[in-house]
């Protein structure tokens, strides 16, 4: 996900 999405808070865009 995004740097701070709310779900995983970090991933591959």
Curated annotation (Swiss-Prot):
Description of post-translational modifications: Glycosylated; contains galactose.
Alphabetical GO biological process terms: chitin catabolic process; defense response to insect; polysaccharide catabolic process
Reaction catalyzed: Random endo-hydrolysis of N-acetyl-beta-D-glucosaminide (1->4)-beta-linkages in chitin and chitodextrins; Endohydrolysis of beta-(1->4)-linkages between D-glucosamine residues in a partly acetylated chitosan
The protein's enzyme class: hydrolase
Residue ranges constituting the Chitin-binding type-1 domain according to the UniProt record: 3-13
Domain of life, per lineage: Eukaryota
Keyword Hydrolase belongs to the record: yes
GO MF entries: chitin binding; chitinase activity; chitosanase activity; endochitinase activity
Compartments (UniProt record): Secreted
Catalytic activity, EC: 3.2.1.132, 3.2.1.14
Alphabetical UniProt keywords: Carbohydrate metabolism, Chitin degradation, Chitin-binding, Glycoprotein, Glycosidase, Hydrolase, Plant defense, Polysaccharide degradation, Secreted
Gene Ontology annotations for the cellular component aspect, listed alphabetically: extracellular region
UniProt function note: Has insecticidal activity when consumed by D.melanogaster larvae. Has low chitinase and chitosanase activity.
The name this protein goes by in its record: Insecticidal protein LA-a
Organism: Morus alba (White mulberry)
